Regions:
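N-terminus-centric sequence/structural signature that marks the extreme N-terminus
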Residues: 1-114
């Protein structure tokens, strides 16, 4: 099971480096939940940060790394779960012309919602 973290400064007053350092400390505290990788995403203008410690199960490639951006870069997700029918949904998305860059169920969820 992965470890996830997030924070929001509703007034967007926290500097980006502070957001990043705080979220990095949060995911470091749950390193044991995801030994494969750890990443942080920061949107300083919106006062938000997401982080994840990854336990790679479905897509073992770097393409499955999180936090993950949608193809149009509008959305970001960090997700801990498993979508059992993600291959079926992925085929539907591809048939509808949606770009897919990985074999990750997280990307399927993200692009289905984007």
């Amino acid at each position: 099971m992965c470890g996830i973290a997030g924070m929001i400064d509703w007034r967007a007053e926290t500097p980006a480096d502070t957001l990043r350092a705080t979220c990095e400390a949060m995911i470091e505290a749950v390193r044991h939940r995801g030994p494969d990788a750890g990443e942080v995403w920061v949107e300083a203008a919106g006062g938000a940060a997401l982080g994840q410690r990854r336990l790679a199960i479905i897509d073992l490639s770097p393409g499955g790394a999180q936090p993950m951006h949608s193809a149009d870069r509008r959305y970001v997700i960090t997700f801990n779960g498993e979508i059992y029918n993600y291959r079926d949904i992925r085929r539907e998305l591809l048939a509808a012309g949606r770009p897919m860059r990985s074999e990750s169920d997280t990307e399927v969820l993200l692009e289905a919602c984007a």
